[in-house]
């Protein structure tokens, strides 16, 4: 026999358990879902993102969630101007950053039975948003499909450290259910 075959078998069995009934099951479900998107999630912070989200909502007749977007008065004006029924739109102002865009909404989406979401954000922000979103939303079995919004000529490539930092923050949230950033800032 090949040395170490027993430990390899144990590792394979543990991975099989983790991805079928264990803690990785929601991630597997999110990655394998074939359902069409059921919501459009716009990460606020840029008016072009909101406009693209509104156009998608009109074209696809999907509900729209804007997280941390423009002020409520301007957002309401955009909705009226686009002719979108306000009952199809949620304006959510709980988020303070990319991480909380997801953590403040993911349980609401899961409760509503949402399994697949179009994620609208600027093309330079999309890689970090997808890193955080895949972890946070994936932990609830929700798949994300990114919709990049052109940001030329004002695009600025985000630093890899920022993406990794937010990714670690999201992973810690998935494991503990808490945002550990305040604790880390106090203790490091």
Model-identified regions with their sequence ranges:
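A structural signal for short, hydrophobic/glycine-enriched beta-strand patches
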Residues: 21-163
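Non-catalytic accessory segments flanking enzymatic or RNA/DNA-binding domains
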Residues: 5, 186-188
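N-terminal membrane-anchoring/stem segments of glycan-assembly enzymes
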Residues: 16, 24-25, 166-170
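Hydrophobic membrane-insertion alpha-helices, especially the h-region
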Residues: 4-22
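A transmembrane-helix-recognition feature enriched in membrane-embedded lipid enzymes
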Residues: 156-183
């Amino acid at each position: 026999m090949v040395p170490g075959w027993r430990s390899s078998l144990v590792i394979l069995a543990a991975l099989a358990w983790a991805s079928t009934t264990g803690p990785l099951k929601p991630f597997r479900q999110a990655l394998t879902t074939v359902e069409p998107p059921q919501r459009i999630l716009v990460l606020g912070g840029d008016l072009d993102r909101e406009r693209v989200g509104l156009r998608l909502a009109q074209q696809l007749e999907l509900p729209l969630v804007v997280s941390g977007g423009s002020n409520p008065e301007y957002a309401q004006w955009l909705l009226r101007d686009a002719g979108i029924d306000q009952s199809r739109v949620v304006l959510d102002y709980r988020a303070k950053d990319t991480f909380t865009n997801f953590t403040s909404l993911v349980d609401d989406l899961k409760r509503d039975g949402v399994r697949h979401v179009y994620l609208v954000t600027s093309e330079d922000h999309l890689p970090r948003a997808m890193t955080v979103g895949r972890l946070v939303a994936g932990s609830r079995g929700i798949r994300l499909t990114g919709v990049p919004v052109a940001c030329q000529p004002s695009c600025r490539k985000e630093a890899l450290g920022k993406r990794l930092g937010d990714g670690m923050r999201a992973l810690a949230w998935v494991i503990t259910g808490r945002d550990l950033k305040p604790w880390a800032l106090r203790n490091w």
